[in-house]
Structures are given as C-alpha cells and as structure tokens.
Amino acid sequence: MGGLIINENGKIEAIGKKVNKNNIPSREKFIDLKEKYIFPGLIDMRVFVGEPGFEYKENFKTLSNAALAGGVTSVVTMPNTSPVIDNVSMVDFLKRRGRDKSKINIYPTATLTKNLEGNNMNEFGLLQKKGIIGFTDGIKTIQNTRVMSRIMKSAYDLNSLIIQHAEDFELAKNGQVNDGIIATKLGLHGIPDYAEKIIVERDLSLLQDYNCRYHISQISSAKSLEVIKRSKDNVNFTTGVSINNLSLNENDIGDFRTFLKLSPPLRTEDDRLSLIKGI
C-alpha cells in the first residue's frame, strides 16, 4: 500500500486519496517511508516516573522526550513515588507537573492500599473524581486474600480498574532471576514460575465472584498463561506481557549482565515461545 501523508505541526492533516499532489508546496520536506511502518501514537501502560522523590532518575520532561522518541504519546504512570500517590493532594501535584512539564498525555494511577502497605484499601471513589484512571500497588502485590477480595468488591461497586503485579512475595523473596539452571549456575536466588501462577489463579478465582475491571500487569510464564486460558470464558479481564519476556529468555542473563535481572524475571525459552503464541 502506497500513498502520501501530509503532516503539519506534528499532526496528520491528510492521508492517501485525500492528498492532492498538485497542492503540495514546493518547500515541503519529503521523507521516504519505504519499508517503514506508521502507527497511531502508542500507549505505555506501565511507566515509573521519578516525580516526586526520584527526580535524579527521571522527571516528566525527560520522560516525555524519551517517550516521543519511541512513538509513545500517552503513558499510564505508576504510584511508586516518594511520597506515594495515595491521596488527593499528591494526585493534584502529579497532574499539575504532568500538565506543565510533559509533552505527552499523562494518565495517573493511585495506590490500591495506603502507603503501598497492602493493608488498608485506598479511597477509590474520591480519587477517581480527581482524575485517577486506575489503582495499583505497582511493583508490589496484594498478598492478603481478604484485602484483595474487599478491593475487588469496592472496584465493582465503583467501576474502578484494578492493576495487579502478580507475584507471591514469600516465594519470590530475595530472588533475582528465574528459578532454574541459570540461577544455580550463577549462584543466585531464583524466582519460581509458580510464584506468579499462584497469584494469577487466586485473583481470577476471586474475580468470578466480584467481576470487577481487572488487569494483570505482566505475565512471564506458560503456567500463568494456562490459568488465563482456562479462565477467559468465565470472567472478564485483561493481561499484559513485557517486551522483555517476548524477546529474551533466562540464557540472555549470562555472566554479570545485571541489567537483565528483571521483574518479572526472564523465563525459559519454552515460556517465551508460549507467550508469543498466546498473543
């Protein structure tokens, strides 16, 4: 498929048959996009911005510049800041900074529980009115089943979106890589795939009773995928997978490649292929 695209001030004004070739000013810059792809602005649903508290890592300005360079025009920010995003004043701060410093769309989330402690549920209704689009404890998982059931009930009543990082803390404690041959070879604590599966299975079981809006932020294993396949006809939910787990496996960690100690960890090649097939 070929054709012309007219871009003015960063926006597509005309495309394909709507472009009149005779009316294109001679001063216009032409870019050959042969063998290239054009997408609408991409959305990143799991972004950790450094404001407030970790500006030395990243701020809204550097975040938006990096996002635009990769074709991302909208991001969903996680609440794992310092202080955390768990009250109205912090939401107001985040929205103001995003509006003043960012060149992209910022969609903030707030914590599921106060101060990310996993105990006391946050004020979903109040924070939604302030513009929060969903609730998550980010890189932390709600470990207490009773707390999670209360969260789901409230989320159903208020039509709130719940985003869960699926990982059993006790099973993953001190883990750095996938539990397997590579972990043994490197002498590192491993994170078993069933640490993820257990939380996925628990939450999807709860979801059968509460049927709230629920999203698993990232899965990494074939075992979790099997649970999802069994549940998808009974409950309504979505799930994500990291590009890391689609393009890399545990063998890529190698010696001293600490930047590949990820959460969730890189799994086996069989896991990677299963995730690709699942998509």
What spans do the regions from the language model cover?
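Histidine/acidic residue-rich metal-binding segments in metalloenzymes
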Residues: 121-279
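Active-site mouth loops of central-metabolism enzymes
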Residues: 45-58, 81, 107-120, 139, ...
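Short, acidic/polar
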Residues: 56-64, 116-126, 202
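Histidine-rich, glycine-flanked metal-binding segment
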Residues: 1-40
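Alpha-helix-loop-beta-strand connector modules within alpha/beta enzyme cores
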Residues: 88-109, 153-167
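Metal-associated gating/positioning segment near the N- to mid-region
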Residues: 34-98
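Divalent metal-coordination and catalytic microenvironments
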Residues: 10, 35, 46, 67, ...
